[in-house]
From Swiss-Prot:
Name of the protein: 3-phosphoshikimate 1-carboxyvinyltransferase
Biochemical pathway: Metabolic intermediate biosynthesis; chorismate biosynthesis; chorismate from D-erythrose 4-phosphate and phosphoenolpyruvate: step 6/7
HAMAP family, per database record: EPSP_synth (MF_00210)
Molecular function as annotated in GO: 3-phosphoshikimate 1-carboxyvinyltransferase activity
Catalytic activity entry: 3-phosphoshikimate + phosphoenolpyruvate = 5-O-(1-carboxyvinyl)-3-phosphoshikimate + phosphate
Species name: Chelativorans sp. (strain BNC1)
Enzyme Commission identifier(s): 2.5.1.19
Amino acid sequence: MNHHLPSRPARSRQSQGLKGNLRVPGDKSISHRALMFGGLASGETRISGLLEGEDVLRTAEAMRAMGAQIDRRDGTWTIRGVGNGCLLEPEAPLDFGNAGTGSRLTMGLVGTYDMTTRFTGDASLSKRPMGRVLNPLREMGTQVLQAEPGDRLPITLRGPKHATPINYRVPMASAQVKSAVLLAGLNTPGVTTVIEPVMTRDHTEKMLSGFGAAIQIETDKEGARHISIQGQGTLKGQVIAVPGDPSSAAFPLVAALIVPGSDILIENVLMNPTRTGLILTLQEMGADIELLNRRSAGGEDVADLRVRSSALKGVTVPASRAPSMIDEYPILAVAASLAEGETVMLGLEELRVKESDRLSAVAEGLKVNGIDCTEGKDTLTVRGRPEGKGLGGATVTTHLDHRIAMAFLVLGLASERPVSVDDQSMIATSFPEFMDLMTGLGAEIEDRD
């Protein structure tokens, strides 16, 4: 388990033009859901391109513990599901490691079953708030038998004999909360409705519909989305090809923009409009990103991205864009560090409850490496240095956060002095091939003894 491994420092240094073609691992959001819905569906589900990072593998283990048969052969995962309403009570606690998505979605999935389920996680996950998911489940009849103060892990849930459908307005822009309520609705009689004032990533609705769930989506005159699911229906196994994760593609993409003389092609990247906030922002900053071979795969938009080094200019990123790029702010802050002028990022409160307090971790890493930035309650302002002059030379504390580690290793590729991170081991949670893919493009990244 990654949270018991010794730390492994790494260092990156100024690199010459990055060149080559690459594929990033499968999308994390879709991978978690493909395993969950396949494990719940009747019949067989086959998945290719699954992200085989630690977080997703924890979801596979959880579904196995509740009765799904899951096998991997030659890169294809085959699942024989239990059928909707037929999950088995797990004998041991479900250990989700560092996986926020896996743990929160599974709480929704099991919360309306008449059984007891215990959730545990690593030190980082155990600091993250789970009340946002538990509150709607309580309304549906779920009992929280045990939790740490502030509704934190470890948590024990007991589902009701008869769950109650609810209409739930999500209090913050969170695809995980929306998804947890919809998954709880799968095993609840009647119609469960989630109302989201701001649209968040919509993989749950799209994929559940693809598996045969009765889902209706309407937008009211205020622009809020009402997503309704008819409970206790049948899900049928599917064949799924998982596209590349845009949140992982963000790292080589920004590296190519800021390392002079770079020209790379990132193939098969998910371009779902609820996930493309970073690309839109970088294009506003002057990034040369060309979308090639645009196509649809399994109901999702996919494209190849040709990225060439670019002179970037600072912009203001509106709060309304945060849900479509919540995982990309660390790497956007790195791009802003090499841009001319000031970049202002608004509406970042959600970053305070990620794998780390991601907002303060980013600001701290920028400052120790000579970057002029100001951290507000929910804002970050970065004043860039286009040539990377005087930047680097420090070690960044990653706080067990994979995206902090990757973002600052990218910073070092365009800084005057090397940048170190205190630990790279947790990169395996989302992007196990990161080091190999980056060095394959010509990035100077190495283990540091």
